[in-house]
A protein has these predicted regions:
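Short, polar/acidic, helix-capping and beta-turn segments at strand->helix junctions
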Residues: 1-90
Length: 90
């Protein structure tokens, strides 16, 4: 856990999500839904600028809410992605 500006925490969080996506053979283009929790909803515009650096094409559905986050973090993001070829048998 790293504490920084909302932009830094957003970029770090999405970088971690990107690594998990890559392990599943996915990219950010495969993300269909994100639920984003901000410690302070007043940070939304700055959060959104950093978020859009990762989602450059068609944006996934997104819910963003203010939440009480533990450990003094500013952002938490849950992402759901479709796995290419997932659910198909050979």
């Amino acid at each position: 856990m790293v504490h920084g500006t909302i932009e830094e925490e957003t970029r770090l969080t999405l970088s971690h999500i990107g690594k998990v996506l890559a392990q599943a053979g996915c990219t950010f283009e495969d993300v269909v839904k994100c639920t984003c929790h901000l410690a302070d909803i007043n940070d939304f515009e700055r959060f959104d600028q950093a978020y859009r650096e990762f989602f450059t094409g068609v944006k996934p559905a997104r819910t963003t809410v203010q939440s009480v986050l533990g450990g003094g973090i500013k952002v938490e993001i849950d992402a759901i992605a479709r796995v290419p070829g997932g659910g198909q048998s050979a």
